[in-house]
């Protein structure tokens, strides 16, 4: 009996061993544990090698500053401290100021710049802070070194608070704070033509004087044909300097255009002086422009821009060949083309600067920046023409308007209600987020 039972058990075991494996057994894999694959000896070997590499490194201390950082600060300082070393008068309403580095306040050398750029001057008048841009009339070469200098020219403007304050108060020895050079009115060979027709009006001649100096000393390589508009001969700025530069370089030619009906206009071939009567029109540009491609650079008062742009539009030039220096600050919204009108003559603006909230009132005919400044609120700004981006702010509520000729915002800024207060007018009460003063 027991023998049969033993045979039966052996038969069952044999039957089980001969059965095919199930799907589960076929698909199963042995799990991999990476921790178990590590060997302690390998870790200690790596640690030893790593320590050896550390010990073989330089014993010199990590420098607190690298040369590239020092160079960046020299080229693009947050501020520059200067003092007035010379004042030159051009009649009762215009002066040229020579600015030298003020070593006593930490500026030993001035930042380098390109002809066509400007600096912003920071001024406090009766406790209110203002910033105004002025084109550099000196050459980049004149700014180099310990004896380097900048030159700016300030002309009185009608109802101009800052310009009149400067002309009445600035004198030799006065200490000033200015920005690093900024702006994009410089000559770029890859974009601009080999010949530039410069159109200047009044004190808008200053960047062209810097260009002419750079051409004469070989730092710029293009031909400058300058059409310089003034009322009469007495209002021409830097005439002697341009006469000298024309003789120094054949690439510089100056034509004076006088608008005064009584002005005597003729070509003096002996001295090289050329005068035209009237205004800078398309036909006048064609008269002096070369047959080859040329660029037009403009710098002058807003009235000149408004007139010249219409004339230039008839010339059929590519857009890249027409360059404008900053349009300049605007002072009256209702005087601008396309102004839609406002809800009231006075607006209330609630301003958030970081965690501070202030509410002020102002004249709706002023730009938003002007309203804030008159209420003692300092907003970072440089160009005051909607170009530099320093005053970039967010409109949280309310309606605003920007003149088309001064609207340089990106599409994203328009979509998400960002503005430049320096060239924007309030059409209703507003809530704004503005950047803090630097």
Task: For each feature predicted by the language model, list its residue ranges.
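Local cysteine-cluster metal-coordination motifs and their immediate loop/turn environment
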Residues: 207, 377-401, 405, 412-428
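Short, low-complexity N-terminal leaders and the immediately following helix N-cap/first helix
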Residues: 2-94
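Ferredoxin-reductase
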Residues: 66-175, 194, 230-232, 243, ...
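Ligand-binding loop in jelly-roll beta-barrel domains
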Residues: 143-149, 190-194, 219, 425-435
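Redox cofactor-anchoring modules in respiratory/redox and cofactor-processing assemblies
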Residues: 313, 323-375, 379-380, 390-395, ...
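FNR/FR-type flavoprotein reductase catalytic core
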Residues: 2-36, 164-350, 357, 364
């Amino acid at each position: 009996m027991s023998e049969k039972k033993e045979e039966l058990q052996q038969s069952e075991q044999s039957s089980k061993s001969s059965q095919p494996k199930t799907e589960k057994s076929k698909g199963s894999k042995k799990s991999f544990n990476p921790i178990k694959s590590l060997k302690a000896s390998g870790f200690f070997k790596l640690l030893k090698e790593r320590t050896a590499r550390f010990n073989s490194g330089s014993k010199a201390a990590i420098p607190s500053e690298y040369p590239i950082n020092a160079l960046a600060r020299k080229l693009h300082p947050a501020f520059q401290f200067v003092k007035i070393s010379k004042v030159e008068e051009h009649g009762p309403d215009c002066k040229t100021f020579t600015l030298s580095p003020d070593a006593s306040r930490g500026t030993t050398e001035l930042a380098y710049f390109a002809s066509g750029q400007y600096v912003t001057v920071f001024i406090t008048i009766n406790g209110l802070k203002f910033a105004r841009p002025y084109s550099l009339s000196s050459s980049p070469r004149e700014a180099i070194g310990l004896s380097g200098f900048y030159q700016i020219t300030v002309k009185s403007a009608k109802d101009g608070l800052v310009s009149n304050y400067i002309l009445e108060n600035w004198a030799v020895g006065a200490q000033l704070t200015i920005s690093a050079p900024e702006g994009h009115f410089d000559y770029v060979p890859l974009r601009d033509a080999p010949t530039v027709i410069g159109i200047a009006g009044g004190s808008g001649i200053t960047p062209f004087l810097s260009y002419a100096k750079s051409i004469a000393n070989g730092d710029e390589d293009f031909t400058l044909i300058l059409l310089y508009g003034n009322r009469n001969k007495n209002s021409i700025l830097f005439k002697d300097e341009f006469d000298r530069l024309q003789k120094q370089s054949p690439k510089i030619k100056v034509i004076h255009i006088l608008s005064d009906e009584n002005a005597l206009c003729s070509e003096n071939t002996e001295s090289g002086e050329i005068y035209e009567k009237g205004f800078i029109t398309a036909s006048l540009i064609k008269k002096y422009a070369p047959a080859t491609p040329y660029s037009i650079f403009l710098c002058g008062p807003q009235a000149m821009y408004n007139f010249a742009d219409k004339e230039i539009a008839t010339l059929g030039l590519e857009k890249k060949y027409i360059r404008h220096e900053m349009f300049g600050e605007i002072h009256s919204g209702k005087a601008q083309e396309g102004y839609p009108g406002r809800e009231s003559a006075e607006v209330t603006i609630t301003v958030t600067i970081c965690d501070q909230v202030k509410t002020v009132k102002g004249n709706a005919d002023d730009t938003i920046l002007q309203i804030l400044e008159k209420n003692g609120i300092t907003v970072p700004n440089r160009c005051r023409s909607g170009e530099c981006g320093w005053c970039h702010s967010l409109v949280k509520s309310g309606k605003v308007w920007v003149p088309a000729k001064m609207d340089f915002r990106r599409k994203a800024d328009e979509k998400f209600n960002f503005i430049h207060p320096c060239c924007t007018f309030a059409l209703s009460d507003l809530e704004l987020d503005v950047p803090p003063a630097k």
